[in-house]
């Protein structure tokens, strides 16, 4: 499979702590937009001080204050904070800092704790591949940090959000600025898909597909699902719930499994490269990565027509949707085997 190497590891603080001594960061990204600027010199400010002083974290400052975390992030630590920029908050649907402050404090606290990891982890200490890091969120709080290297450099991401400024040092830890707000998972892949109204026809197809499909999408094995939207299904003979329920189960099962990747289990979009991807069973689709983070898929049964992995839009996340057992990317065409 031509995916950038992803190594799943639950050995977090033990492995990473042993790598911290003596490291300094030299990090080059795949393009200027993704290039993590680095500030390796130890700072004299706490994480809270850094957030307050920075003009790119005004939304985050509002969130920290509303969530009651200013004292925590000024504490001894050490902490690693994946800090969404103001642009990241805008992309999540917050118009300004006032809109952030108007959000429920319990909601903001849950989201922010999902960005805070115990321990100080500079980007240079993050192993190549994918590493599971538990956050300060007690329920469904694991994040997945990926470091992938190509001919043009090395990039670091967390749950698909790119690190755009790495290693801002504080007296009580380190801050990595990221380009997207991380949303904690609300359930497994099946539950997340069922709760999304734009994927209701996919939900009907899964139900028609039978216990094996349901078990796979709700099980413990990590997986990646390329999820056709309702519009994608409407362009096929399976364009209504009635049509789906009238379809042969075997045919639907073959189609559905062609959208599931189990190796690697969590393929976040920054880690996908051009080339074949083996789907569940013996199927295969071909990925093509273009400029501007464009990503398309080609399946043998689509007659040369590609399926596009949808870009995130303001207030709507379409790719790198995290579930407790995997990740979902919405696509605009059903992948026919």
Question: What is the predicted role of each segment?
Answer:
Residues 2-19, 23-337:
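Mature, structured domains of secreted/extracytosolic soluble proteins
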